[in-house]
Protein backbone atom coordinates (compact mmCIF):
# COMPACT_ATOMS: atom_id res chain seq x y z
CA UNK A 1 0.00 0.00 0.00
CA UNK A 2 1.33 3.41 -0.94
CA UNK A 3 0.59 4.75 2.56
CA UNK A 4 3.10 2.28 3.97
CA UNK A 5 5.83 3.58 1.67
CA UNK A 6 4.99 7.17 2.58
CA UNK A 7 5.19 6.35 6.27
CA UNK A 8 8.51 4.59 5.74
CA UNK A 9 9.83 7.67 3.92
CA UNK A 10 8.63 9.85 6.75
CA UNK A 11 10.24 7.52 9.25
CA UNK A 12 13.56 7.74 7.43
CA UNK A 13 13.33 11.53 7.39
CA UNK A 14 12.50 11.48 11.07
CA UNK A 15 15.59 9.39 11.88
CA UNK A 16 17.81 11.85 10.02
CA UNK A 17 16.21 14.81 11.76
CA UNK A 18 16.38 13.14 15.16
CA UNK A 19 20.07 13.87 15.54
CA UNK A 20 19.40 17.57 15.17
CA UNK A 21 16.37 17.80 17.40
CA UNK A 22 16.88 15.11 20.03
CA UNK A 23 17.53 17.64 22.72
CA UNK A 24 14.06 19.10 22.20
CA UNK A 25 12.26 15.86 22.90
CA UNK A 26 12.76 15.79 26.65
CA UNK A 27 11.60 19.37 27.00
CA UNK A 28 8.83 19.37 24.39
CA UNK A 29 5.30 19.66 25.68
CA UNK A 30 3.27 16.54 26.31
CA UNK A 31 -0.55 16.76 26.13
CA UNK A 32 -1.95 17.42 29.58
CA UNK A 33 -3.61 14.30 30.96
CA UNK A 34 -4.49 15.55 34.41
CA UNK A 35 -6.15 18.51 36.04
CA UNK A 36 -8.75 20.80 34.51
CA UNK A 37 -8.69 21.94 30.88
CA UNK A 38 -10.93 24.51 29.22
CA UNK A 39 -12.95 23.26 26.25
CA UNK A 40 -15.10 26.02 24.72
CA UNK A 41 -18.65 25.09 23.83
CA UNK A 42 -19.31 22.53 26.55
CA UNK A 43 -22.71 22.82 28.20
CA UNK A 44 -21.65 20.77 31.25
CA UNK A 45 -18.45 19.36 32.74
CA UNK A 46 -16.85 16.36 31.01
CA UNK A 47 -14.53 13.86 32.68
CA UNK A 48 -11.76 11.99 30.84
CA UNK A 49 -10.12 9.03 32.56
CA UNK A 50 -7.18 7.08 31.14
CA UNK A 51 -6.19 3.52 31.94
CA UNK A 52 -2.68 2.14 32.25
CA UNK A 53 -2.38 1.94 28.45
CA UNK A 54 -3.37 5.57 28.01
CA UNK A 55 -6.76 4.69 26.50
CA UNK A 56 -9.23 7.53 27.23
CA UNK A 57 -12.70 6.98 28.68
CA UNK A 58 -14.92 10.03 28.19
CA UNK A 59 -17.89 10.70 30.47
CA UNK A 60 -20.31 13.45 29.42
CA UNK A 61 -23.83 14.53 30.34
CA UNK A 62 -25.05 14.79 26.74
CA UNK A 63 -24.07 13.59 23.27
CA UNK A 64 -22.80 16.89 21.78
CA UNK A 65 -20.44 17.37 24.74
CA UNK A 66 -19.30 13.76 24.40
CA UNK A 67 -18.44 14.21 20.72
CA UNK A 68 -16.76 17.57 21.33
CA UNK A 69 -14.57 15.99 24.00
CA UNK A 70 -13.82 13.03 21.73
CA UNK A 71 -12.56 15.39 19.03
CA UNK A 72 -10.40 17.20 21.57
CA UNK A 73 -8.92 14.01 23.03
CA UNK A 74 -8.31 12.49 19.60
CA UNK A 75 -6.37 15.59 18.56
CA UNK A 76 -4.37 15.30 21.78
CA UNK A 77 -3.36 11.75 20.90
CA UNK A 78 -3.26 11.63 17.10
CA UNK A 79 -2.93 15.12 15.62
CA UNK A 80 0.14 14.23 13.58
CA UNK A 81 -1.59 11.18 12.14
CA UNK A 82 -4.68 13.21 11.30
CA UNK A 83 -2.65 15.90 9.56
CA UNK A 84 -0.64 13.29 7.66
CA UNK A 85 -3.81 11.65 6.37
CA UNK A 86 -5.22 15.02 5.35
CA UNK A 87 -2.03 16.07 3.56
CA UNK A 88 -2.16 12.74 1.71
CA UNK A 89 -5.71 12.99 0.35
CA UNK A 90 -5.25 16.69 -0.43
CA UNK A 91 -2.10 15.95 -2.44
CA UNK A 92 0.26 18.05 -0.28
CA UNK A 93 2.86 15.48 0.77
CA UNK A 94 5.58 16.53 -1.65
CA UNK A 95 5.71 19.97 -0.03
CA UNK A 96 6.82 18.24 3.17
CA UNK A 97 8.82 15.19 2.11
CA UNK A 98 9.92 16.12 -1.40
CA UNK A 99 10.05 13.82 -4.41
CA UNK A 100 9.00 10.80 -2.32
CA UNK A 101 5.50 12.25 -2.00
CA UNK A 102 5.01 13.41 -5.60
CA UNK A 103 3.47 10.21 -6.99
CA UNK A 104 0.95 10.14 -4.16
CA UNK A 105 0.10 13.83 -4.67
CA UNK A 106 -0.54 13.28 -8.38
CA UNK A 107 -2.69 10.26 -7.61
CA UNK A 108 -4.81 12.10 -5.05
CA UNK A 109 -5.25 15.15 -7.29
CA UNK A 110 -6.40 12.93 -10.16
CA UNK A 111 -8.85 11.01 -7.98
CA UNK A 112 -10.24 14.27 -6.61
CA UNK A 113 -11.02 13.03 -3.10
CA UNK A 114 -10.88 16.56 -1.75
CA UNK A 115 -13.26 18.01 -4.35
CA UNK A 116 -15.68 15.08 -4.20
CA UNK A 117 -15.81 15.27 -0.43
CA UNK A 118 -16.71 18.94 -0.49
CA UNK A 119 -19.59 18.21 -2.84
CA UNK A 120 -20.67 15.36 -0.60
CA UNK A 121 -20.54 17.62 2.47
CA UNK A 122 -23.04 20.00 0.87
CA UNK A 123 -25.56 17.13 0.82
CA UNK A 124 -25.23 16.17 4.48
CA UNK A 125 -28.46 16.07 6.46
CA UNK A 126 -29.02 18.23 9.51
CA UNK A 127 -28.72 15.14 11.72
CA UNK A 128 -25.35 14.24 10.20
CA UNK A 129 -24.07 17.77 10.67
CA UNK A 130 -25.25 17.79 14.27
CA UNK A 131 -23.23 14.62 14.88
CA UNK A 132 -20.05 15.73 13.08
CA UNK A 133 -19.78 19.42 14.00
CA UNK A 134 -19.15 19.02 17.76
CA UNK A 135 -16.29 16.64 16.99
CA UNK A 136 -14.77 19.14 14.54
CA UNK A 137 -15.14 21.89 17.14
CA UNK A 138 -13.32 19.74 19.68
CA UNK A 139 -10.43 19.09 17.30
CA UNK A 140 -10.10 22.79 16.53
CA UNK A 141 -10.31 23.73 20.21
CA UNK A 142 -7.23 21.64 20.86
CA UNK A 143 -5.38 23.01 17.82
CA UNK A 144 -6.16 26.63 18.72
CA UNK A 145 -5.69 26.59 22.48
CA UNK A 146 -2.83 24.11 22.90
CA UNK A 147 -0.27 25.04 20.27
CA UNK A 148 2.53 24.18 22.69
CA UNK A 149 1.23 20.61 22.90
CA UNK A 150 1.35 19.91 19.16
CA UNK A 151 3.36 16.80 18.27
CA UNK A 152 7.04 17.29 17.55
CA UNK A 153 6.64 15.21 14.38
CA UNK A 154 4.65 17.99 12.72
CA UNK A 155 7.62 20.33 12.81
CA UNK A 156 10.11 17.63 11.84
CA UNK A 157 8.16 16.71 8.71
CA UNK A 158 7.07 20.25 7.92
CA UNK A 159 3.31 19.90 8.37
CA UNK A 160 1.15 22.57 9.97
CA UNK A 161 -1.87 21.90 12.15
CA UNK A 162 -4.69 23.65 10.29
CA UNK A 163 -8.32 24.12 11.33
CA UNK A 164 -10.56 21.19 10.47
CA UNK A 165 -13.88 21.33 8.62
CA UNK A 166 -16.83 18.99 8.14
CA UNK A 167 -15.48 18.27 4.66
CA UNK A 168 -12.31 16.84 6.20
CA UNK A 169 -14.28 14.21 8.09
CA UNK A 170 -16.13 13.27 4.91
CA UNK A 171 -12.84 13.19 2.99
CA UNK A 172 -11.37 10.79 5.54
CA UNK A 173 -14.21 8.37 4.82
CA UNK A 174 -13.60 8.68 1.07
CA UNK A 175 -9.88 8.21 1.61
CA UNK A 176 -10.33 5.07 3.71
CA UNK A 177 -12.76 3.66 1.16
CA UNK A 178 -10.14 4.23 -1.53
CA UNK A 179 -7.28 2.64 0.39
CA UNK A 180 -9.34 -0.41 1.39
CA UNK A 181 -11.13 -1.10 -1.90
CA UNK A 182 -8.63 -1.19 -4.72
CA UNK A 183 -10.20 -3.47 -7.29
CA UNK A 184 -9.83 -0.76 -9.94
CA UNK A 185 -6.23 -1.92 -10.40
CA UNK A 186 -7.49 -5.42 -11.10
CA UNK A 187 -9.97 -3.94 -13.59
CA UNK A 188 -7.16 -2.21 -15.47
CA UNK A 189 -5.18 -5.44 -15.57
CA UNK A 190 -8.24 -7.35 -16.78
CA UNK A 191 -8.84 -4.81 -19.54
CA UNK A 192 -5.22 -4.98 -20.68
CA UNK A 193 -5.33 -8.77 -20.77
CA UNK A 194 -8.55 -8.67 -22.80
CA UNK A 195 -7.07 -6.14 -25.22
CA UNK A 196 -3.99 -8.25 -25.87
CA UNK A 197 -5.36 -11.80 -25.60
CA UNK A 198 -9.06 -11.48 -26.21
CA UNK A 199 -11.75 -11.91 -23.60
CA UNK A 200 -11.90 -15.71 -23.72
CA UNK A 201 -8.17 -16.27 -23.20
CA UNK A 202 -7.99 -13.46 -20.64
CA UNK A 203 -10.71 -15.19 -18.62
CA UNK A 204 -8.48 -18.26 -18.35
CA UNK A 205 -5.89 -16.15 -16.52
CA UNK A 206 -8.12 -13.91 -14.46
CA UNK A 207 -11.84 -14.19 -13.64
CA UNK A 208 -13.74 -11.36 -15.30
CA UNK A 209 -17.19 -10.32 -16.41
CA UNK A 210 -18.25 -8.96 -19.77
CA UNK A 211 -19.35 -5.35 -20.00
CA UNK A 212 -22.97 -5.30 -18.93
CA UNK A 213 -23.78 -2.54 -21.39
CA UNK A 214 -23.14 -4.93 -24.29
CA UNK A 215 -23.97 -8.39 -22.96
CA UNK A 216 -25.00 -10.00 -19.71
CA UNK A 217 -22.64 -12.52 -18.18
CA UNK A 218 -23.34 -16.00 -19.55
CA UNK A 219 -23.73 -19.13 -17.47
CA UNK A 220 -20.48 -20.02 -15.81
CA UNK A 221 -19.12 -16.47 -15.88
CA UNK A 222 -18.77 -14.91 -12.46
CA UNK A 223 -18.22 -11.48 -11.05
CA UNK A 224 -14.72 -11.09 -9.74
CA UNK A 225 -11.91 -8.79 -8.72
CA UNK A 226 -11.47 -8.16 -12.43
CA UNK A 227 -14.90 -6.63 -12.69
CA UNK A 228 -16.57 -5.72 -15.98
CA UNK A 229 -14.50 -5.38 -19.13
CA UNK A 230 -15.27 -3.66 -22.39
CA UNK A 231 -14.72 -4.99 -25.86
CA UNK A 232 -11.25 -4.17 -27.12
CA UNK A 233 -11.44 -0.47 -28.07
CA UNK A 234 -9.58 1.19 -30.92
CA UNK A 235 -5.86 1.46 -30.29
CA UNK A 236 -5.96 5.23 -30.50
CA UNK A 237 -7.04 6.82 -27.29
CA UNK A 238 -7.91 3.86 -25.12
CA UNK A 239 -4.43 2.37 -25.01
CA UNK A 240 -3.02 5.81 -24.28
CA UNK A 241 -5.53 6.28 -21.49
CA UNK A 242 -4.70 2.96 -19.85
CA UNK A 243 -1.01 3.72 -20.17
CA UNK A 244 -1.45 7.04 -18.40
CA UNK A 245 -3.41 5.45 -15.60
CA UNK A 246 -0.80 2.71 -15.32
CA UNK A 247 1.88 5.33 -14.86
CA UNK A 248 -0.12 6.99 -12.11
CA UNK A 249 -0.83 3.82 -10.20
CA UNK A 250 2.20 1.68 -11.00
CA UNK A 251 3.53 1.82 -7.42
CA UNK A 252 0.44 -0.10 -6.28
CA UNK A 253 0.26 -3.67 -7.66
CA UNK A 254 -3.14 -5.40 -7.68
CA UNK A 255 -4.08 -7.10 -4.45
CA UNK A 256 -4.37 -10.84 -4.15
CA UNK A 257 -8.06 -11.57 -4.64
CA UNK A 258 -8.03 -14.10 -1.78
CA UNK A 259 -7.40 -11.69 1.08
CA UNK A 260 -10.01 -10.14 3.32
CA UNK A 261 -10.84 -9.46 6.94
CA UNK A 262 -13.15 -11.36 9.25
CA UNK A 263 -15.54 -11.46 12.19
CA UNK A 264 -16.11 -14.51 14.35
CA UNK A 265 -19.25 -14.77 16.47
CA UNK A 266 -19.53 -17.37 19.25
CA UNK A 267 -22.89 -18.08 20.85
CA UNK A 268 -23.28 -18.09 24.60
CA UNK A 269 -23.95 -21.84 24.49
CA UNK A 270 -20.47 -22.50 23.09
CA UNK A 271 -18.31 -20.10 25.10
CA UNK A 272 -16.49 -20.95 28.33
CA UNK A 273 -17.92 -17.85 29.99
CA UNK A 274 -21.49 -18.59 29.02
CA UNK A 275 -21.72 -15.26 27.21
CA UNK A 276 -21.71 -14.47 23.50
CA UNK A 277 -18.38 -13.38 22.03
CA UNK A 278 -17.31 -11.49 18.92
CA UNK A 279 -13.74 -11.53 17.58
CA UNK A 280 -13.01 -8.95 14.89
CA UNK A 281 -9.87 -8.99 12.71
CA UNK A 282 -9.87 -6.03 10.28
CA UNK A 283 -6.55 -7.10 8.68
CA UNK A 284 -4.78 -3.76 9.00
CA UNK A 285 -1.00 -3.49 8.95
CA UNK A 286 0.17 -3.64 12.56
CA UNK A 287 3.65 -2.43 11.59
CA UNK A 288 2.39 1.14 11.14
CA UNK A 289 2.63 3.20 14.31
CA UNK A 290 0.46 4.67 15.53
CA UNK A 291 -2.10 2.17 14.35
CA UNK A 292 -5.03 3.04 12.11
CA UNK A 293 -7.53 2.85 14.97
CA UNK A 294 -7.85 5.05 18.04
CA UNK A 295 -9.29 3.15 21.05
CA UNK A 296 -11.71 5.08 23.25
CA UNK A 297 -14.58 4.64 25.69
CA UNK A 298 -17.69 6.81 25.27
CA UNK A 299 -20.24 7.32 28.05
CA UNK A 300 -23.28 9.61 28.09
CA UNK A 301 -27.03 9.18 28.67
CA UNK A 302 -28.04 6.45 26.20
CA UNK A 303 -24.42 5.70 25.23
CA UNK A 304 -22.26 3.11 27.00
CA UNK A 305 -19.64 2.00 24.49
CA UNK A 306 -15.98 1.10 24.22
CA UNK A 307 -14.06 0.31 21.07
CA UNK A 308 -12.09 2.13 18.41
CA UNK A 309 -12.52 4.48 15.50
CA UNK A 310 -10.35 6.20 12.93
CA UNK A 311 -8.64 9.38 14.14
CA UNK A 312 -10.88 12.00 12.57
CA UNK A 313 -14.22 10.16 12.87
CA UNK A 314 -16.60 10.60 15.83
CA UNK A 315 -18.21 7.65 17.55
CA UNK A 316 -16.96 4.09 17.08
CA UNK A 317 -16.37 1.88 14.05
CA UNK A 318 -15.91 -1.28 16.09
CA UNK A 319 -16.49 -2.12 19.72
CA UNK A 320 -19.25 -3.05 22.12
CA UNK A 321 -22.08 -1.59 24.16
CA UNK A 322 -23.97 -3.14 27.06
CA UNK A 323 -26.26 -4.75 24.46
CA UNK A 324 -24.28 -5.62 21.34
CA UNK A 325 -20.78 -6.02 19.88
CA UNK A 326 -19.94 -4.91 16.35
CA UNK A 327 -16.94 -5.02 14.05
CA UNK A 328 -15.59 -4.11 10.64
CA UNK A 329 -15.01 -6.68 7.91
CA UNK A 330 -13.57 -5.75 4.54
CA UNK A 331 -14.60 -8.09 1.73
CA UNK A 332 -12.47 -6.27 -0.88
CA UNK A 333 -15.46 -6.44 -3.18
CA UNK A 334 -15.95 -4.99 -6.64
CA UNK A 335 -16.99 -1.49 -5.59
CA UNK A 336 -14.92 0.61 -8.02
CA UNK A 337 -15.24 1.07 -11.77
CA UNK A 338 -12.73 2.25 -14.34
CA UNK A 339 -13.99 4.01 -17.45
CA UNK A 340 -11.67 4.13 -20.45
CA UNK A 341 -12.44 7.03 -22.76
CA UNK A 342 -11.53 6.97 -26.45
CA UNK A 343 -9.73 10.02 -27.77
CA UNK A 344 -11.08 11.66 -30.89
CA UNK A 345 -8.49 10.82 -33.58
CA UNK A 346 -9.28 14.17 -35.21
CA UNK A 347 -8.82 16.17 -32.03
CA UNK A 348 -6.79 14.81 -29.09
CA UNK A 349 -8.36 17.46 -26.83
CA UNK A 350 -11.73 15.72 -27.27
CA UNK A 351 -13.11 12.28 -26.46
CA UNK A 352 -15.82 10.25 -28.22
CA UNK A 353 -19.15 9.60 -26.52
CA UNK A 354 -22.16 8.20 -28.34
CA UNK A 355 -20.79 9.27 -31.70
CA UNK A 356 -20.16 12.80 -30.49
CA UNK A 357 -16.82 14.52 -30.00
CA UNK A 358 -16.81 16.23 -26.60
CA UNK A 359 -14.10 18.44 -25.09
CA UNK A 360 -12.22 17.39 -21.98
CA UNK A 361 -12.58 19.64 -18.98
CA UNK A 362 -9.13 20.70 -17.89
CA UNK A 363 -8.18 21.18 -14.26
CA UNK A 364 -4.60 22.35 -14.00
CA UNK A 365 -3.01 22.30 -10.56
CA UNK A 366 0.44 23.14 -9.26
CA UNK A 367 2.12 20.76 -6.83
CA UNK A 368 4.79 22.16 -4.54
CA UNK A 369 7.80 19.88 -4.06
CA UNK A 370 10.32 20.34 -1.28
CA UNK A 371 13.74 20.74 -2.90
CA UNK A 372 16.84 21.96 -1.10
CA UNK A 373 18.44 22.98 -4.40
CA UNK A 374 15.50 25.17 -5.49
CA UNK A 375 15.17 28.86 -4.57
CA UNK A 376 13.40 29.06 -1.23
CA UNK A 377 13.66 25.29 -0.85
CA UNK A 378 10.54 24.63 -2.93
CA UNK A 379 9.79 23.98 -6.60
CA UNK A 380 6.58 23.41 -8.54
Label each residue range with its predicted role.
Residues 59, 67-69, 274-275, 286-290, ...:
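Short helix/loop capping segments that flank catalytic or ligand/cofactor-binding pockets
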Residues 260-262, 273, 292-294, 313, ...:
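Residues that flank catalytic or metal-binding motifs in active/ligand-binding sites
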Residues 301-377:
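Compact, glycine/acidic-enriched structural inserts
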Residues 1-15:
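N-terminal Sec-pathway targeting helices
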Residues 157, 167-178, 292-297, 332-335, ...:
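Short secondary-structure boundary/capping segments
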Residues 153, 207, 364-368, 379-380:
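Ser/Thr- (and often Asn-) enriched beta-sheet segments in non-cytosolic proteins
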Residues 5, 19-277, 282, 289, ...:
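Substrate-recognition/specificity elements adjacent to catalytic centers across diverse enzyme folds
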Residues 13-21, 317:
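Hydrophobic cores of alpha-helical transmembrane segments in multi-pass integral membrane proteins
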Amino acid sequence: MFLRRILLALGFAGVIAAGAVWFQVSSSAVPAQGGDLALPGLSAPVTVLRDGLGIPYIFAQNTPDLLRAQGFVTAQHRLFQMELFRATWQGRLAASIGEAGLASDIRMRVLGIEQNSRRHTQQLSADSRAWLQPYVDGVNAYIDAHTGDHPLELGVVGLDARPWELADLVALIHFVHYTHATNFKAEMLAQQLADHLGAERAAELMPLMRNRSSARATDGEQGSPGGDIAAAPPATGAAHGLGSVRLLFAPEPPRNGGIGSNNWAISAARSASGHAMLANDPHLDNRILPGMFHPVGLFAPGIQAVGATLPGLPGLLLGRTEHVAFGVTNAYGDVQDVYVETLDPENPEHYLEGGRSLPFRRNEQLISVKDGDAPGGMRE
